[in-house]
């Protein structure tokens, strides 16, 4: 669709890249933005009074406003970070003080470990209960499961907006509305790392308390991410990472912290990453989420139908065949062939896919699976890529089939 915009393919023109859920490739505009900082700015934030440093700080302020507008937030609700994992861990540390042994933390069974382990460890540390919402066979959370699992002592609910295994999208506004009807006081945290690469986010409509996502899933660079937090939380919560740039007074008996976001951004940020994140957001806006969604659904439907038509009952699509509820990700199992063998042999043919548990062991173990093979699509993919994948998979099946 837009392969010419990605310099990666200048170096690897024959490669079929079907692993965008691990990290998306970077368009030239994003690469140029990072190089621009490194070559033309290369100064720190809020440290220097000379013009170049002030220009850098002003540009980061512009990108913070751009990021806020992108998800319908306020600039002071946007905290830059090294990625989704880092900020979810930081958030768990921040919320630790408010948690007691009488409380419960609830997560879904399809969470990435980044939105599972921090809450599991926090519950263990505070001797709180740790509960898991079990999803249906189609990857959603039922009202009955919410009612059975959420109780008055539920303090935190953590959910992924889009599973990195099944590709199934949650109806986030409806899900959060249902959670709030049962436990209106609970803090709701959403991992949107996969979702934001495929569909627009409106944090006001979602009504989550915190939302985290990474730049590198969004055609941006690695090492940069965002934590959105409602302003009424951020203005009262205490930081748990300390250093330069986040205090008004460090000398008194009690430290006086700056307002958000400064109080949560101690030390030097990944400034080149922030420049590039701004370019990635502009890139997505230039394409448009509607076009992106149509592209995603066309490819995943085509891939799913070709797998079933070609291999029949040997292939099981994880999360079902309702392509309208999933976006950008299609995982499957193949009877008699291990996903690692499939991925390794595909790799030797220049086709890049992911195999394993995808940092989502609870989901795999809960479904009796040791691994799955995952295809994940980007703007640079086409039906021709899927045809090449199917042809290669036919050859792998023939290679590994028992000989009579």
Regions found by a protein language model. Give the residues of each.
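Pyridoxal 5′-phosphate
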Residues: 1-404
